[in-house]
């Protein structure tokens, strides 16, 4: 039986978190290759530590000369990312960081299983399971804890970059414990915020005085009470941050990237992967389907699972769970979803317009719950499939 009164906690990390620095770099490199060739194959991993960034993985372009040319663009892409994030500290600076590029051409054996032949649809780039989720807790149909944890850090990054609060550093984390009553989020029982600061003399109380107005401004009215616990920089000073403080890797913040633990995760990371990789494209499609089910009024809460096999085009299974909030049986929704959208890798990419350089912007503050953009960014957040789903039932 579902619980109605409880606390649920989610965390977010800022664009300057070491792992997010790596996600950003990997997706920026992906975008560069997609700008040259929409069908480019990219699997880019990044490692960052004190004074060093290492890039590795596989890339493929149809033009070998262009491939060599774009390999040479990795260094300025990395430096541009680090500069935009805001790192200019002694041991991690966009001008002086040492960059090692170990990218190489994609395996022909992988390519032959994925590429479309004359008599065969393009297959999935790997086996795997992917989940999508939506819930009518926020206008974006996202779980409230992760939505507001992201919002706080986005706001702090905004005021840092504008110069309004230049004393803040790029590295930060947030965590919210949200109180639910009758299944509805109504307040925050605790707030955890750790943020890098550039002035060594600042105390935890000083930092709280800086960030508290912005935190209050991002949360709904009435959510913070006298009983809300505040933990701002609870360990004291936080001056050394980013990859100089802790090493970073691409793909280590998969729960931050998705639903904050409110839904299952198939295990595959997103950043640095071109959309032939179903780890990414099918997870985006799953979110798209779940969001449209909720937007159609068919459920208050919806989880979708898709599964794939490498070299096989069609999904092996489509699963829907409306968590006892559905207006129709889940099996009927599953059948309808298979009718209204081509869920092969190419079908997903075509429907959502994914062969575009739209991924660097996804690397921080969540891949979901964002506004669809005019150039095709966050197309999986549209609710333009809702009527078709209802018509197919």
From Swiss-Prot:
Query: Which reaction does this enzyme catalyse, per its entry?
Result: L-methionine + ATP + H2O = S-adenosyl-L-methionine + phosphate + diphosphate
Main localization of the protein described in the UniProt heading? cytoplasm
GO cellular component labels? cytoplasm
- Residues in a coiled coil are none
Its subcellular locations are: Cytoplasm
Q: Where does L-methionine bind?
A: 58, 106, 246, 277
Cofactor(s) essential for the protein: Mg(2+); K(+)
Q: Can the keyword Zinc be found in this entry's annotation?
A: no
- Name the positions where K(+) binds: 45
A Pfam family per the record: S-AdoMet_synt_N
Residues that hold ATP according to the record: 17, 171-173, 237-238, 246, 252-253, 269, 273
Q: What class of enzyme is it?
A: transferase
GO process terms (BP)? one-carbon metabolic process; S-adenosylmethionine biosynthetic process
Keywords from UniProt, A to Z, are: ATP-binding, Cytoplasm, Magnesium, Metal-binding, Nucleotide-binding, One-carbon metabolism, Potassium, Transferase
GO MF term set: ATP binding; magnesium ion binding; methionine adenosyltransferase activity
Q: Which Gene3D superfamilies match?
A: 3.30.300.10
Q: How does it assemble?
A: Homotetramer; dimer of dimers.
Protein name from the UniProt record: S-adenosylmethionine synthase
Origin species, per record, is Jannaschia sp. (strain CCS1)
| Organism taxonomic ancestry | Bacteria, Pseudomonadati, Pseudomonadota, Alphaproteobacteria, Rhodobacterales
> Which gene is the coding source of this polypeptide chain?
metK
